Design a protein with these regions (language model features):
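Core nucleotide-handling region used for phosphoryl-transfer chemistry
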Residues: 2-532
Length: 532
């Protein structure tokens, strides 16, 4: 079938929590199992059944820690036995349960009765899936092999949306070698997948998690800021799904990824209110509401502001300045940790400069950590700011994205000139700067280089501390991972690679109903009806 827009990405879609068209690669045997196999999908380990998928098949991969559409799960009978009433085949299950009850209610059960009960119970299980009522996709271990995500055939999706039945999935593949295709969260106009958030009794005030364009629309609502002058940070993509974008000879910089909260601070042109006389206020009001005498009144209008450079600061997606965003709340942490850091660094921000970074440690003056367990060596009640990105805009409008090494040099110079800042500001930790072919010279460029270099990076303890505990934290917590950027990249982008140990800890926290700010920010705007 001709390629149409059956699969689309909503404005709030986050690539880390969505579906993806994929091509199945090599099936690797799993010790002790004749019917299970491991396959690397989008750079991530998956366990599949050999009788369901084979090398070269095209499929749809639902990424880890997502929630799937309830109607999709129902029509495919994917809810677990305990939630069978949500499945389309509920009447068959009820019939089997009644037969099982008849055998179990006998005063005396024969050996043959027990065999029948076992057969009926096995049949009942086969009619149901393994999803709980929330439709959560989560990591599981099968035969000691981690399996991230959920893999489905096109026919399974077509049970929910018949329009997609004859789609040629190969047309949606972006990189044939890696078997990586397009990301999407919407099928035929209906939301299929979204980030999973554990149900909690009292949810903290949520900031927006709209993707970059939607976040940026918020700036337009604040008349005192130009949307061209203030930019929220772009989304950091997963290296697993984007390793194919990196060439062996690309000059890259790899830095340590910190587990904190995002912070943006800028010194940009803002509109500062001017106190007007009653007469001028009246003229301005009339001009605003009147549709007549526009030409006459417009000549009388007096600007109620002047433009000058001023400080604007925000979390990942919410402008915090009260004078700009009058409806701002204290947010996820119930305190303005961003304002605390902003007061420290704003005197050193040049005109036209925007600084992006991570705040880590504890909430100021509190024994509560910004991210549970991740103290990063801070004393109780203390924190620090690590800049990882800087942009500048000259008065003529020329914009420049700084290299990571320049961000590092700027931070080091700032601390050197102002030693009193050394406990509050830290430079980005650069772990490697160069090409990946030089970092891993033994990996052949001609034979599956992307897959092999990604696997090497995932297990690189020497350079990147992967799968180790974080060496800086006093608590024993897993190292989160790394961030890769291309040097002199014409596109503002970065790619993250998290450790398996971090994913496991994240899963355990979600199982316990705990959610951090990054995931909390990924809920607003989603359209799936979450089942309580």
């Amino acid at each position: 079938m001709k390629k149409l827009n059956f699969f689309t990405a909503s404005p709030e879609m986050k690539s880390e929590y969505c579906a993806q068209v994929v091509k199945i690669g090599e099936l690797k045997p799993i010790e002790g199992s004749d019917y299970l196999a491991q396959v690397i999908i989008s750079g991530t380990s998956m366990v599949i059944r050999k009788d369901e998928f084979k090398t070269g098949d095209y499929a749809i991969y639902c990424k880890n820690e997502t929630a799937l559409n309830p109607d999709f799960l129902s029509l495919n009978n994917l809810y677990e036995v305990g939630e069978f009433m949500r499945n389309a085949n509920r009447e068959k299950v009820i019939e089997l349960q009644e037969n099982i009850y008849k055998y179990n209610s006998k005063v005396v059960r024969t050996e043959e009765d027990l065999m029948h009960i076992k057969e009926l119970e096995d049949r009942l299980k086969s009619l149901c899936g393994f999803f709980n009522k929330h439709g959560r996709v989560k990591m599981i271990n099968l035969r000691k092999v981690p399996s991230f995500g959920f893999l489905i055939k096109l026919d399974t999706l077509a049970n929910w949306k018949p329009q997609v039945k004859d789609i040629d999935l190969s047309e949606y593949i972006l990189n044939e070698e890696m078997g990586i295709g397009m990301d999407f969260d919407t099928v035929c106009g209906e939301k299929f997948i979204q980030v999973y958030i554990p149900p909690i009794k009292e949810r903290p005030a949520r900031n927006s998690q709209k993707r970059e364009k939607k976040r940026q629309k918020k700036v337009e609502r604040f008349e005192r800021i130009s949307k061209e002058d203030f930019k929220f940070h772009y989304d950091t993509q997963s290296l697993n799904s984007n390793i194919w974008r990196i060439e062996p000879t690309d000059n890259v910089v790899i830095s340590k990824k910190l587990h904190g909260t995002s912070f943006i601070t800028a010194n940009i042109p803002v509109k500062v209110p001017i106190k007007l006389s009653f007469y001028n206020k009246f003229i301005n009001w009339v001009y605003k509401v009147s549709t007549r005498f526009v030409n006459y009144l417009s000549a009388k209008v007096v600007q109620n502001y002047k433009v000058e450079y001023g400080n604007v600061y925000s979390s990942r997606s919410v402008i915090k300045n009260q004078f700009i965003n009058e409806k701002v709340t204290s947010g996820f942490y119930k305190t303005d940790v961003w304002g605390d850091i902003n007061e420290i660094i704003k005197p050193y921000i040049d005109k036209g400069m925007t600084i992006y970074g991570e705040i880590c440690g504890y909430l100021t003056g509190s024994d509560k950590m910004i991210q549970k367990g991740y103290d990063y060596g801070c004393k109780i009640g203390e924190n620090f700011f690590m800049p990882y990105r800087i942009t500048t805009t000259n008065e003529d409008g020329t914009k420049r994205e700084w290299e990571v090494t320049e961000v590092y040099d700027w931070t080091v110079k700032l601390i050197s000139e102002h030693p009193e800042l050394k406990d509050k500001i830290q430079p980005i930790t650069i772990l490697y700067n160069g090409s990946l072919s030089n970092l891993y010279p033994d990996i052949s460029i001609q034979n599956h280089w992307h897959e092999n270099v990604l696997e090497a990076m995932k297990n690189d303890k020497k350079h990147f501390y992967m799968e180790c505990n974080d060496p800086v934290c006093k608590n024993k917590v897993p190292y989160e991972g790394i961030v890769l950027r291309k040097n002199e990249d014409p596109i503002a982008e970065a790619f993250k690679l998290k450790t398996l140990a971090f994913f496991k800890r994240e899963k355990a926290n979600i199982d316990a109903g705990e959610v951090d700010m990054e995931m909390s920010n990924s809920t607003e705007g989603n359209e799936l009806e979450l089942i309580n």
